């Protein structure tokens, strides 16, 4: 299977700006907001910081050290998870979005903390550019799996037994394994073919989580309440989950 490169999604991408701007409109005065990680969230944090300077009262909980730095730079006060009760909503990005709004995440390596922050929120809002929409999860990339280092060998064996092609993720320099903020490894698993439907994705998720040493996966299935899709012409649309 050929893995296509992920789309631009950078700070200058008009589709990302459109999605982030629409997400900021959802933030009510006094809200406690979960801040995921990644390039789209970085743009959202910048825009949320601008609204705070205009007088919007808001506090945040971040899912990664990178988002902590961005939030502090934007002037967004940060609180501890659980401080003051549940979060009103979490805004995060995704690497792939299926038609049923199932997600594939984890390219940034912060998926465990992203899931924790989302679970502490009343709703999860995902912001993406239109290039992240796929017909089936796994169409554009591998499935990330976070693994405890001591369990690397048996976990790799069991991942291969599922018909996956696992590869330990390296730091950008390529000289050593990437270590998550939880002290674990990321193993990127190539699929023989995309997951044709939600049932297939859920079967894979169950099989992955049953492997000893696997902490979490990049499959976020049924977690998104709203996906905001930005387009290159500057407009954005809401896609809501029917629950």
Go through each PLM region and give its residues.
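Conserved phosphate- and dinucleotide-binding cores of soluble alpha/beta proteins
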Residues: 2-14, 65-243
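N-terminal glycine-/serine-/threonine-rich phosphate-binding loop
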Residues: 1-89
């Amino acid at each position: 299977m050929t893995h296509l490169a992920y789309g631009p999604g950078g700070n200058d991408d008009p589709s990302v700006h459109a999605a982030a701007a629409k997400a900021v409109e959802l933030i009510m005065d006094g809200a406690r907001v979960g801040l995921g990680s990644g390039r789209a969230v970085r743009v959202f944090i910048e825009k949320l910081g601008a609204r705070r300077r205009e007088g919007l009262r808001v506090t945040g909980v971040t899912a990664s050290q990178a988002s902590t730095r961005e939030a502090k730079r934007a002037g967004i006060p940060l609180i501890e998870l659980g401080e003051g009760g549940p979060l009103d909503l979490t805004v995060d990005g995704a690497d792939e979005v299926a038609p049923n709004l199932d997600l594939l995440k984890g390219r940034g390596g912060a998926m465990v903390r992203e899931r924790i922050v989302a679970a502490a929120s009343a709703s999860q809002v995902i912001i993406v550019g239109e290039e992240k929409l796929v017909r089936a999860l796994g169409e554009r990339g591998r499935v990330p799996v976070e693994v405890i280092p001591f369990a690397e060998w048996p976990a790799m064996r069991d991942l291969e037994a599922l018909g996956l092609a696992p590869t330990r993720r390296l730091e950008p320099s390529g000289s050593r394994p990437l270590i998550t903020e939880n002290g674990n490894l990321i193993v990127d698993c190539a699929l023989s073919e995309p997951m044709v439907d939600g049932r297939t994705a859920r079967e894979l998720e169950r099989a992955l989580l049953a492997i000893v040493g696997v902490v979490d996966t990049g499959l976020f299935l049924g977690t998104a309440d709203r996906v905001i899709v930005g387009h290159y012409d500057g407009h954005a649309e809401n896609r809501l989950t029917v629950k």
